[in-house]
Amino acid sequence: MQVILKEDVVNLGYKDDIVTVKDGYGRNFLIPTGKAVIASESAKKVLAENLKQRAHKLAKIKEDAQTLAAKLEGVALTIGAKTSSTGTIFGSVTNIQVAEALAKAGFENIDRKIIYIKESVKEVGSYKAVLKLHKEVSVEVPFEVVSE
């Protein structure tokens, strides 16, 4: 029996895969629990159309991410932090402060969850943050930490 998976199933396949399973497993478990549907010709056509639309959407999202990455290439950020007389920051600079600096620079729609700082920022100096805009598109943004 061939079925189309509606969600990921461990040791069987991923969402939208067409897999062959034993009749009992398909009829008694996968279909009643909503994890799969029977792979009829009409269901295969609907799946093909959905995959085509999803691929188009994903291409648009990737294109938007590449456009944003090109805009972010020339951006240099300055982040102010309270420091001691030796240049050590009270606390540390995190992705939240980088997101706020990006918002001030005109990039309000960048979420802090996509910003990764490789090293701990606890002193005044120059650092780099990596923005993972898409699974295939990331950009490195330099930022300077200065004393307030």
Swiss-Prot record:
InterPro entries, alphabetized:
Ribosomal_bL9 (IPR000244), Ribosomal_bL9/RNase_H1_N (IPR009027), Ribosomal_bL9_bac/chp (IPR020594), Ribosomal_bL9_C (IPR020069), Ribosomal_bL9_C_sf (IPR036791), Ribosomal_bL9_N (IPR020070), Ribosomal_bL9_N_sf (IPR036935)
Q: Does the keyword Cell cycle apply?
A: no
GO CC term (a single one)? ribonucleoprotein complex
What is the superkingdom listed in this entry's lineage? Bacteria
Question: Cross-referenced Gene3D superfamilies, in alphabetical order?
Answer: Ribosomal protein L9, C-terminal domain, Ribosomal protein L9, N-terminal domain
Ribonucleoprotein listed as a keyword? yes
One GO-annotated biological process of the protein: translation
Single Gene Ontology MF annotation: rRNA binding
What is the role of this chain?
Answer: Binds to the 23S rRNA.
Which family is this sequence assigned to? Belongs to the bacterial ribosomal protein bL9 family.
Which protein is depicted? Large ribosomal subunit protein bL9
